[in-house]
């Protein structure tokens, strides 16, 4: 759709083509900014919708630019480049949205450690961490249920936004609500526990944990892959993504 709009704009006039490029660049810039600040994104976009758009939301802006470029292309190599870019955009859209077409995972018997839920696969850290945190605030659930609510999929797992969506849906109609916040490491000691966050594992991978105490030189976590874990503050700071899900009384 946005590709066709860009193509139409460029065919209509060079000025409209340039405007389409500017709009596409602005779209990309805003979307990238929202990916870095999901706490702002959930205030602008309903979280249920955002959870489904986060992997594909940049594509309309990109395709608008590509459509305008194709419409303005005068040389054969420019048209070839525009076609290749169109294919790249389509592939990115398919990759980002593929999880919605995948079946939910079939999980084995749950494993608990002192009432906390250990992940049963290498991709269900979000499901296990959210189930653990919810249990700590008095809402019983399972890894299997939270895998469904958080859109967990084999291999790809889930995301912080989908975790927030799943927890929000689980808490619907209850006295407790979830809040997604941006917080510095030094601020975590002032927030109520348990809280959920993701830690960076390399450039692309993320691993969700439950923060139990962030007030000292070590941060006490429940890591659903191994259980209780005490992480040096400097190491935690280096891996922390800057966003947490906390629990608060509804209306408070």
Language-model features, listed with the residues they occupy:
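N-terminal signal-anchor transmembrane helix
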Residues: 103-111
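Active-site-proximal loop/helix segment associated with metal-binding centers of metalloenzymes
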Residues: 125
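An acidic helix/loop motif centered on a single conserved Asp/Glu
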Residues: 128-129
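Conserved active-site-adjacent core of cysteine acyl-enzyme catalytic domains
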Residues: 1-82, 89-104, 135-136, 140-252
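Second-shell loop/turn segments in exported
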Residues: 112-122, 132, 147-157
């Amino acid at each position: 759709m946005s590709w066709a709009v860009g193509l139409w704009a460029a065919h209509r006039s060079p000025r409209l083509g340039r405007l389409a490029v500017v709009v596409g660049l602005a779209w990309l810039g805003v979307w990238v900014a929202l990916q870095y600040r999901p706490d702002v994104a959930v205030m602008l976009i309903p979280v249920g919708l955002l959870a489904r758009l986060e992997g594909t939301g940049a594509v309309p802006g990109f395709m608008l630019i590509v459509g305008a470029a194709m419409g303005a292309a005068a040389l054969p190599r420019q048209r070839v480049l525009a076609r290749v870019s169109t294919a790249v955009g389509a592939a990115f859209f398919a990759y980002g949205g593929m999880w919605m077409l995948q079946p939910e995972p079939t999980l084995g018997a749950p494993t608990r450690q002192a009432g906390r839920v250990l992940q049963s696969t290498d991709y269900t850290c979000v499901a296990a961490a959210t189930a653990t945190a919810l249990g700590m605030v008095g809402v019983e659930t399972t890894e299997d249920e939270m895998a469904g609510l958080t859109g967990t999929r084999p291999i790809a797992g889930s995301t912080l936004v989908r975790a927030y969506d799943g927890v929000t849906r689980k808490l619907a109609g209850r006295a407790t609500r979830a809040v997604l916040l941006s917080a510095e490491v030094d601020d975590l000691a002032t927030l109520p526990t348990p809280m959920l966050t993701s830690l960076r594992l390399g450039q692309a991978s993320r691993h969700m944990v439950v923060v139990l105490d962030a007030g000292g030189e070590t941060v006490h976590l429940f890591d659903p892959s191994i259980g209780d874990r005490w992480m040096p503050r400097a190491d935690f700071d280096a891996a922390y993504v800057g966003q947490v899900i906390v629990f608060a009384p509804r209306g408070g």
